[in-house]
């Protein structure tokens, strides 16, 4: 999860988020090299008196500045497309959870179980216990098994929302009348926090998301106690 004065991303907890972090570093290095080259050329132009006022045609230069950007774009596009296809791929999920956005809370339904559904509201600041996080704790956490593929079906019953958990690399729009889906898989247990990431009204900032990833045995015990 995030911590005060944090500058980087949250720790990756899913294979998709790990890929996104690698892609970020890859793209940032390319941007850094381009920026360094541009700054070097600008400083060279400002500090030297050598100019080419008589140059009317330079096919070699035009060829280079056409081919080089194309190569750079390919180096950025290929890994990006790979991750996009990975995020859309869903192969035989072990569990399906339907998420509905409301003003201003989330409701969850475990479609593989009978009568396993609940609403998830933010715990007001006045009711927080010592050690709990302000504006991030909920009364009902979403308990999921770790190291298993989980399909999230996301929609809304009123306005646009967005179901997002940064450490898992998840951000799926909740649109009324439309069912979007996303896949998540956690590589380790723990609590993972997110928030609605689409402005949805006056209490938009009071729609936290808390996922509790546990071993399969603990998940089965929890689901049996909830049914």
From Swiss-Prot:
CDD domains from the UniProt entry: CcO_II_C
Cofactor info, note text: Binds a dinuclear copper A center per subunit.
Listed GO MF terms: copper ion binding; cytochrome-c oxidase activity
Binding site for Cu cation A1: 161, 196, 200, 207
Localization (cell): Mitochondrion inner membrane
Gene3D superfamilies the record matches: 1.10.287.90, Cupredoxins - blue copper proteins
Keywords: Copper, Electron transport, Magnesium, Membrane, Metal-binding, Mitochondrion, Mitochondrion inner membrane, Respiratory chain, Translocase, Transmembrane, Transmembrane helix, Transport
Positions of Cu cation A2 binding: 196, 198, 200, 204
Transmembrane segments: 15-45, 60-87
Any single GO CC term annotated in Swiss-Prot or TrEMBL for this entry: respiratory chain complex IV
A UniProt-annotated Pfam family: COX2_TM
Membrane topology label: Multi-pass membrane protein
InterPro entries referenced in this protein's UniProt entry, alphabetically: CcO_II, CcO_II-like_C, CcO_II_C, Copper_CuA, Cupredoxin, Cyt_c_oxidase_su2, Cyt_c_oxidase_su2_TM_dom, Cyt_c_oxidase_su2_TM_sf
Domain of life where this protein originates: Eukaryota
Catalytic activity, as annotated: 4 Fe(II)-[cytochrome c] + O2 + 8 H(+)(in) = 4 Fe(III)-[cytochrome c] + 2 H2O + 4 H(+)(out)
Positions annotated to bind Mg(2+): 198
E.C. number: 7.1.1.9
Mitochondrial matrix side: 46-59
Gene Ontology biological process: ATP synthesis coupled electron transport
UniProt cofactor(s): Cu cation
Function per UniProt: Component of the cytochrome c oxidase, the last enzyme in the mitochondrial electron transport chain which drives oxidative phosphorylation. The respiratory chain contains 3 multisubunit complexes succinate dehydrogenase (complex II, CII), ubiquinol-cytochrome c oxidoreductase (cytochrome b-c1 complex, complex III, CIII) and cytochrome c oxidase (complex IV, CIV), that cooperate to transfer electrons derived from NADH and succinate to molecular oxygen, creating an electrochemical gradient over the inner membrane that drives transmembrane transport and the ATP synthase.
Recorded family membership: Belongs to the cytochrome c oxidase subunit 2 family.
Subunit structure: Component of the cytochrome c oxidase (complex IV, CIV), a multisubunit enzyme composed of 14 subunits. The complex is composed of a catalytic core of 3 subunits MT-CO1, MT-CO2 and MT-CO3, encoded in the mitochondrial DNA, and 11 supernumerary subunits COX4I, COX5A, COX5B, COX6A, COX6B, COX6C, COX7A, COX7B, COX7C, COX8 and NDUFA4, which are encoded in the nuclear genome.
The protein's name: Cytochrome c oxidase subunit 2
Organism name: Antilocapra americana
């Amino acid at each position: 999860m995030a911590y005060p004065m944090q500058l980087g991303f949250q720790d990756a907890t899913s294979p998709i988020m790990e890929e996104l972090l690698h892609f970020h570093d890859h793209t940032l290095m390319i941007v850094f090299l381009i920026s360094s080259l541009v700054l070097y050329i600008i400083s060279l132009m400002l500090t030297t008196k050598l100019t080419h006022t008589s140059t009317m045609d330079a096919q070699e230069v035009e060829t280079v500045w056409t081919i080089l950007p194309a190569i750079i774009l390919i180096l950025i596009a290929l890994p990006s497309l790979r991750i996009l296809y990975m995020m859309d791929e869903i192969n035989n999920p072990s569990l399906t959870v339907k998420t509905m956005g409301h003003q201003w809370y989330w409701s969850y339904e475990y479609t593989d179980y009978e009568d396993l559904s609940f609403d998830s509201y933010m715990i007001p600041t006045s009711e927080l216990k010592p050690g709990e996080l302000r504006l991030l704790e909920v009364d009902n956490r979403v308990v999921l098994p770790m190291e298993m593929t989980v399909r999230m079906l996301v929609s809304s019953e009123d306005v646009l929302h967005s179901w997002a958990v940064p450490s898992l690399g998840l951000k799926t729009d909740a649109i009324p009348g439309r069912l979007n889906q996303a896949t998540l898989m956690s590589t380790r247990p723990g609590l993972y926090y997110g928030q609605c990431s689409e402005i949805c009204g006056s209490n938009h900032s009071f729609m936290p998301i808390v996922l509790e990833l546990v071993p399969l045995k603990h998940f089965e015990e929890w689901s049996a106690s909830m049914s």
